[in-house]
Amino acid sequence: MRFVSWNVNGIRAVLKKNFLEVFDAFDADIFAIQETKCQVGQVELDLPGYHQYWSAAEKKGYSGTAVFTREESLRVLHGLGNEYLDAEGRIVACEFPQFWFVNAYTPNSQMELARIDHRLSLIHI
């Protein structure tokens, strides 16, 4: 299996550049993106042969993750049960018969580790 993970720093911006060409070139079984910065349904991707699982932040234009899979997932989780972090759309977890695939976009610690506690809270769930 081929897995690809890419922090796109805004899906709408990268769609104007080369996202679809890169997506096709990797020919991945599972393709995960982080920092989509869009609401669910705001961007429609035509990815024949792929199932799409999106998780968006409540705050518009902030964080967000998505997973595109050839095989349909048995179950999809959009978060890990922590209301504060789940509201930021940082997790898409897909269950398959033999494994779980977890796409996580961890919070930035910022300069001088000002937000390290926020970042670690995701790890300690």
Residue ranges, per PLM feature:
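N-terminal, active-site-proximal structural segment of metallo-dependent hydrolase catalytic domains
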Residues: 1-47, 51, 57, 62
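Structured beta-strand-rich core segments of catalytic domains in phosphoester-bond hydrolases
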Residues: 37, 42-111
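Short, solvent-exposed loop/turn segments at secondary-structure boundaries
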Residues: 113-118
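Conserved small/polar residues in nucleotide/adenosyl-binding loops
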Residues: 123-125
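A conditional alpha-helix N-cap/helix-loop micro-motif detector
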Residues: 12, 84, 119-120
